[in-house]
Amino acid sequence: MKVIPAIDLMDGQVVRLRRGKAKDKTVYSDDPVKVALTWEKDGADMLHIVDLDATLGRGNNIDMIRNITDAVSIPVEAAGGLRSIDLVAGALEGADRVVLGTLAFRDRDALREILESYGSKKIVISVDHVKGKIMVDGWRENTGINLVDAMQGFVGAGFTEFLLTDVDRDGMMQGPETDTLGKVCRMSDSHVIASGGITVPGDVKSVRDAGAWGVILGKALYEGKVSVKGAISC
């Protein structure tokens, strides 16, 4: 299973939010490149970089993301605010792949064009949910779309890479919800990355046993509860 540290960027800093709320922010570093190099040195398989300012429509961290992708040699996936074909194209000039959430649910024509242009391995569909219902727009809008139905539709359309985030558990350090994860992983041979709730090393094993292809390490990593090396050895 791939071990993937998250680097969430806001105002050029590495931060973590609780349940995606900007007012509930903790700053962990003023040097995102140094953080990225640390996780790479520790053995991370990939980096998951989220531009929270772009997600929330309050600017972007494009230059900082470019600095990170220039500095590391491991793959980088970029997420946050990629809601147009042009923004996706720009992100892929530096990142190895992009994570699409709001665009995937609101603009199927653009999504189809992106798939045709870049192929399924470059596109990660973000299926963020609260109690099995899809959330978009920086987790501010509940679409009412059923998670399993959405996954089946995307798999049928040719997508193979997914990021599953349990919004209620993100940044809360309450442990992952593995029942839904297991159900989603059993649906197809697609790659599913689990995100949200990882708190102790045993949680990493739990999501691996549920069938996850990868796991995002967020707040627990920055709080010292889980290490990259420890997650790899689980």
UniProtKB/Swiss-Prot annotation:
Keyword Amino-acid biosynthesis applies: yes
GO function terms (MF aspect): 1-(5-phosphoribosyl)-5-[(5-phosphoribosylamino)methylideneamino]imidazole-4-carboxamide isomerase activity
Compartment(s): Cytoplasm
Record bears the keyword Nucleotide-binding: no
Signal peptide: none
Keyword list, A-Z: Amino-acid biosynthesis, Cytoplasm, Histidine biosynthesis, Isomerase
Gene Ontology cellular component list: cytoplasm
Active site, renumbered: 8, 128
Chief location: cytoplasm
Catalytic reactions on record: 1-(5-phospho-beta-D-ribosyl)-5-[(5-phospho-beta-D-ribosylamino)methylideneamino]imidazole-4-carboxamide = 5-[(5-phospho-1-deoxy-D-ribulos-1-ylimino)methylamino]-1-(5-phospho-beta-D-ribosyl)imidazole-4-carboxamide
GO biological process: one example: L-histidine biosynthetic process
InterPro entries: Aldolase_TIM, His_biosynth, HisA_bact_arch, Isoase_HisA-like, Isoase_HisA-like_bact, RibuloseP-bd_barrel
Family annotation (Pfam families): His_biosynth
Enzyme Commission number(s) of this protein: 5.3.1.16
Pathway: Amino-acid biosynthesis; L-histidine biosynthesis; L-histidine from 5-phospho-alpha-D-ribose 1-diphosphate: step 4/9
HAMAP family the UniProt entry points to: HisA
Family designation: Belongs to the HisA/HisF family.
Protein name: 1-(5-phosphoribosyl)-5-[(5-phosphoribosylamino)methylideneamino] imidazole-4-carboxamide isomerase
Gene from which this protein is expressed: hisA
